[in-house]
Design a protein with these regions (language model features):
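N-terminal active-site segment of His-dependent metallophosphoesterases
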Residues: 34-59
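Acidic metal-phosphate-binding loop of nucleotide-sugar-dependent transferases
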Residues: 78-79
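C-terminal accessory regions of radical SAM enzymes
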Residues: 224-288
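Radical SAM/AdoMet-radical enzyme domain recognition
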Residues: 52-73, 82-175, 179-183
């Protein structure tokens, strides 16, 4: 299939900047499919004051590019373990049109979520089969719905522990509230050098791949802050016409070569690593002078225009979700 373009169905989302920020690499899990550098506590948590300065600089730059709304996705490690996490969220929420989404394993006690969930627009749970207590996740997600906060669970599907993963899915489906979503997520092999060529999909069978074709349970958004400007549903333009585009479908079908495409990585999405270094997109490794690889507490320049992709493989779901055109 020849794809000419992928873009958001709702044009308002083109005026939204998505910031993925790894606050540190401290985690209370030690998953077999996760690189040690992502959970071994080898980098300190971010400095709160430096981060506030960066946040101000970011708003000033991107507002001049026509960005009106900002989605902050905080990961780790486990971001909720950061001692200043709540204060960081409060500072961001003091500015208009900011939406915070922790990417979390959900292991914090229920009372923590009951107290602090008011700071979040939504919560994305990474469900790790080797450590998760699925009944606890159900209790947390049900409570978030009662607080009118959207959530979705991404279940990491290990092909060699498939039955355990399916058992977890069944526990999640048996929740009191059905508005929060459940999505099976394909895993990629741990890579040594962080090059796109090494990010190969786990060896799923054709039957196993079927679970990635559609959400297990679609998310029914209930947050009063939700509107079309925050809907990132996508379409693609092909030789056969206009069709819906699902990034999970693209990755599982090895539609990962976007080289030569104009891509909005850096304009629509940026990533900040646990070492404070910034990148375009999320896992994107396209170079951009005076931005890519720079630390956010040093001198740098934010991107000002789309880039031309020169990578042969783009397998990070978040990067695939960035608009692209030939």
């Amino acid at each position: 299939m020849l794809i000419e373009k992928i873009d958001y169905k709702f044009k308002e989302f083109n005026r939204v900047l998505q910031i993925e920020w790894t606050l540190g690499n401290t985690c209370n899990y030690n998953c077999s499919y996760c690189l040690p550098i992502l959970h071994n506590n080898s980098f300190p948590w971010i400095n709160l004051d430096e981060s506030k300065t960066f946040i101000d600089k970011l708003h000033n730059h991107y507002s001049k590019l026509g960005i009106t709304d900002y989605i902050w996705k905080f990961g780790g490690g486990e971001p909720t373990l950061y001692k200043d996490f709540v204060e960081l969220c409060v500072y961001i929420n003091s500015k208009p049109n900011n939406y915070i989404i922790p990417i979390t394993n959900g292991s914090r006690k229920l009372h923590w979520w009951q107290e602090h969930a008011k700071n979040f627009f939504a919560v994305h749970f990474s469900i790790h089969p080797e450590f998760v207590d699925p009944n606890h996740i159900v209790a947390v997600c049900d409570n978030l719905i009662e607080q009118k906060i959207d959530s979705i669970c991404h279940v990491m599907m290990k092909p060699n522990d498939w039955n355990r993963c399916l058992e977890i899915v069944e526990v999640l489906k048996n929740s009191q509230h059905k508005q929060w979503g459940i999505q099976a997520k394909p895993l990629h092999h741990t890579w040594e050098l962080d090059t796109a060529e090494e990010r190969d999909l786990y060896p799923y069978t054709a039957e196993q791949k079927q679970i990635f074709q559609a959400p297990i349970r679609a998310q029914n958004r209930i947050s009063p802050r939700v509107d079309s400007k925050l809907n990132r549903d996508m379409y693609m333009v092909t030789e056969e016409g206009i069709k819906d585009f699902d990034p999970y479908w693209a990755v599982t079908h090895d539609i990962v070569d976007w080289s030569g495409f104009k891509c909005d990585a850096g304009i629509n999405r940026i990533y900040i690593n646990y070492d404070k270094r910034m990148y375009l997109g999320a896992g994107c490794r396209v170079e951009l002078n005076n931005f890519v690889g720079k630390k956010y507490n040093e001198e740098f320049e934010f991107p000002t225009k789309s880039i031309i992709c020169n990578q042969r493989r783009c397998v990070c779901i978040a990067d695939v979700q960035v608009p692209k055109s030939r």
